[in-house]
Amino acid sequence: MKRMAVIFVTLMAASVIVVAQQRGGPPPPPPPLESGASQADVDKALIAAPPNLRNQATVIKWKPADWSYDTLRKGTNTLVCVDNSGLPGQAPFSVECTQRGNLPRMAQNMKIETDPDRAKRQAAVDAMEKDGTRIKPEFGSVWYHLRGQDQATANSHVTIAVPGATMASMGLPESGRGGGVWIMNPGTSTAHLMVPGE
């Protein structure tokens, strides 16, 4: 119940910020690009961002050699977006956004996904869960994904991270069979809320 309250308060706070931004004057201009950054790269990464957060989001670009990143544009809100298209383990078109605090988790995910063997990837995740080295996402953070063969046919997918959550801790089902919001991967650092239609 406590975690549900945290999610509720987070969503309400975000709603208040959005409403407040809509009431004022025009939104501030987007932040400038970092030296050497391409506007096309920034624009592509931002496709996954909600319209109300897109203008001030940070945009990064992965460096696959070590999964560190370069900042293409430093935003003023907490959202960070990246174009993963064609990188190891990713769809030909793949963009995602989440909260800045999830960057260590994103980098760890990218490292894991470089292994083409699905069973080995899952074994690596299971081992990290067991030994405590799996980096947790921020509780209540939203992940926005858009993936597919190309932008025109890409599917949108939105999840809310609730690491460690179970039916006992949140009061939500651990299966989507009944319809409505449910917890996928309960009890793990990967636990997240699935929202039908998102």
What are the residue ranges of the model-derived segments?
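Boundary at the C-terminal end of the N-terminal hydrophobic targeting segment
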Residues: 18-22
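Positively charged n-region of N-terminal signal peptides that target proteins for export
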Residues: 1-4
